[in-house]
Amino acid sequence: MRLKTLASLPLFALLTSCYYLQSTSIPIKTIHYTQSAEQADKRERQLMVLLPGIGDRAGVFDKHGVIDAIHTTHPNMDVIAVDAHFKYYEARTIIERLRQDIIKPAIDAGYSAIYLGGTSLGGFGSLLYLKQYPDDINKIFILAPYLGDAQDYNYLIENTAAPEVPRDVNLWPWLIQLPDDVKNKIYIAYGTNDKFAVPNGLLAKQLPPEHTVTQTGKHNWKTWAQLWPELLARQ
């Protein structure tokens, strides 16, 4: 039986996504999911770290069946869902918190592989982490990731010059020059009617074809819940 442990996540915070009520707590709040109550040898286990989209909280992945989908296809994989809400991105502390509170301890614990997964803003966060610490992460699985504003990528569509001074959160100068070893770590899925379908498609062109999953759908959990199992099966 799967065991779920709630790590310092108040019920009130779980029930609200109002930005003004969110705080950037240290350490960042998490929910841990393991397959049994017995302490497993971490050297034989893998870890998936999940980042929610804007307006969602850590429990959203369990609610929509993602945790069960992961454990069905990867029975030796532990999962940590992170309460990585918008305030961490606004404060530019999301990468520091992920590394100090989750990834570095997981590396020290001896996990055989560490993956990141995220929806929407969480996909953006996964890419930010991979860019800064590529050696920490084996693969990332991103669903309909936010990839910046149109001003960041329109030049790729219009075949014009790139912006002279990219914004500090603009990933496109990196995304269009990904080294092969990084390309092979990225898996993306999105609905063809998603509001981010255009930039998602631009990223998909940078990746091996088998790393992309699409289906009819919009930017919502109805679509993502169907895409998650197929994306996980691609690795």
Predicted regions and their residues:
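Alpha/beta-hydrolase active-site loop
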Residues: Y89-D108
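Short, surface-exposed "cap/lid" segments of acyl-processing enzymes
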Residues: S23-H71
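Active-site nucleophile loop of the alpha/beta-hydrolase fold
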Residues: F141-A150
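Conserved alpha/beta-hydrolase
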Residues: H71-Y88
